[in-house]
Amino acid sequence: MTNNQNELGDVMDVLEDNIGYLTDRDREIPETDVAVIKYSAWWEIPVLETEDPLDFLTIGNNQCPASDDWDKLLNAELYDMPRRSQANSESTPPEHTWSGTSELGNYHYSYNDISIGMDAMSMNNRNRDDGFSSSSSSSQTSEGSEWLPEETEFKPKKVVTSEPLSPTPPETETRRLTKVQRRSMTDQEVEQRRKEANKKNSKNYNFNKKSKEAKLKEDLEKNHLYIERATAQEKQTLERIMECYTYFGDGNVLVIHQDAMQNFTEKEVFEEKLEQVDMDVARAREQSQELKSLKKLYQKHRQAYITATNDKALKKSKINTYGSRKSRALHSMNIAELELKKCILQFKIKKFERREKLLEEVENQIKQYFNFKESNHAGYMRLPQERQNRFEELCKTLKTSSPKTSIAGSHRRSTRSSEN
């Protein structure tokens, strides 16, 4: 050993002999509890002094400076050691730990004591990113228990929760058998476990398909409701606009000035724009590849369902299973049909949205002329009393009407909220 450098082997021998240990009290803790080391072996490691003529170093070569709250961190966070035989509902093992495994041992601890780097020889470096993780802790389990590790912080587990749509929610799939568990089971037990797993998978499949059908039916109901409201509002707005056009023209109540004619939509132009909107949407529907694919998919599943229904061997079978060929074909056909109907309704909704936008634009143009300041008094006096009263009602309605909430906008917002 030189004056300024200790032999690496001597340093490692000292560290290995003095790293954290369990007391007799910790070993007496029952299997269901969690053993916790209340103190650290960090203070037990001897300081190997080296010569420092310039007095630059204030600590030994195998020590590192500690912060003021180091003692609190050691006792509070770094020394929880859950046994590997803990139940599934308990907390996950600490990060960057190594777990020794033994089939005959009663105590299995995950030590997270002192992390020693070969280069820096740093202690308890929690921020290192060496990718070290426990591989043996998830491969073996203690006898009579199953310990399922959760996802680490690098791969968060996404949990999607939804209300059950049927009285029997899907059952959680059991974990795979380990080699030790497989060797301890008979062939009959393995076959029984396989049948139970198939039954659970069939129930889960049936539940997922029914959930998807229910979601599509809910979306279709919302789309039908929107179309009903949009149809009623469009009819009312269109009748009001057409009635307003009857008061425009030479010698009539309202006269459009020549300089304002280029910005005003006349009745003939308005009708042409409505027809153009319908033609554009119809053309987009005919050229839609998505709609064509959904039609082919529906025909495919429908033919598969007809084939399964007419299968003589399946008719003679009295077994009623969740995942039978006929049941799968029926669910697939129903889902394909609902998706096709939903796509068709989307084009109708798009047509109503464009027509609603055009109606709102034209009504805003007409609204500014419906007042007595812009009206021709002589033309107004020539009108029958009923028409005069109706003109006054239109003036009040268009003047006092607040900007209405667009049905198309509210429908889009509700659709986005349901998808989220």
Swiss-Prot record:
Residues 184-199 have a biased composition (Basic and acidic residues). GO terms for biological process: protein glycosylation. Disulfide bonds: none annotated. Keywords: Coiled coil. Residues 85-103, 399-408 have a biased composition (Polar residues). Residues 84-103, 122-211, 399-420 are annotated as: Disordered. Residues 410-420 have a biased composition (Basic residues). This is Uncharacterized protein T07A5.7. It comes from Caenorhabditis elegans. The lineage of its organism: Eukaryota, Metazoa, Ecdysozoa, Nematoda, Chromadorea.
